Amino acid sequence: MGLETEKADAQIYMDEDSYSRHSGLGYPEPEKCAKSTQDRDPRGLNTHLKMGFEDVIGEPESTHSFDKVWICSHALFEVSKYLIYKVLTVLLAIPLAFVAGILFATLSCLHIWIVVPFVKTCLMVLPSVQTVWHSITDGFIAPLYKSMGLIFSSISLRLSPE
């Protein structure tokens, strides 16, 4: 309760023999499986998710919990984050990848076969519309605003002191 003077570091050690970086499945030929050092986020799309215990929980100097509580909570945080992520990816990764593939395929198809031809058609028709628009503005709108400008330009304001 604040009497500890040394900072306790909590770390989890796992032997490489009993720990597999894969999903726990044994691979007969390690050359054919993905390397554990492979960068799965080469463009840094999810760098904001690199969050540790210290980024979420912090105790100021004046209020410290017991060292054992701090160590156990740190270990529980890391283990639960790891295990729940693994369980959720087992349950959701393949279906969501399938849905995302369908979504991106649909959007690509719509963009290629509908959006781009529509935009090209509009750009092809716009010079004709531009000519008609200039004729309308030069024939009707420009004279109207020119007349209004002449009317309002003849108004003068004089202020006299009282």
Curated annotation (Swiss-Prot):
Region Disordered, annotated ranges: 19-40
Cellular component annotations (GO), alphabetically ordered: caveola; cytoplasmic vesicle; focal adhesion; Golgi membrane; nucleus; perinuclear region of cytoplasm; plasma membrane raft; sarcolemma
Entry membrane topology: Peripheral membrane protein
Residue positions, PTM Phosphoserine: S20, S23, S36
GO terms classed as biological process: caveola assembly; endoplasmic reticulum organization; insulin receptor signaling pathway; mitochondrion organization; negative regulation of endothelial cell proliferation; positive regulation of dopamine receptor signaling pathway; regulation of cytosolic calcium ion concentration; skeletal muscle fiber development
Cytoplasmic face residues: 1-86, 108-162
Oligomer and partners: Monomer or homodimer. Interacts with CAV1; the interaction forms a stable heterooligomeric complex that is required for targeting to lipid rafts and for caveolae formation. Tyrosine phosphorylated forms do not form heterooligomers with the Tyr-19-phosphorylated form existing as a monomer or dimer, and the Tyr-27-form as a monomer only. Interacts (tyrosine phosphorylated form) with the SH2 domain-containing proteins, RASA1, NCK1 and SRC. Interacts (tyrosine phosphorylated form) with INSR, the interaction (Tyr-27-phosphorylated form) is increased on insulin stimulation.
Protein name: Caveolin-2
Taxonomic source organism: Didelphis virginiana (North American opossum)
Gene giving rise to this polypeptide: CAV2
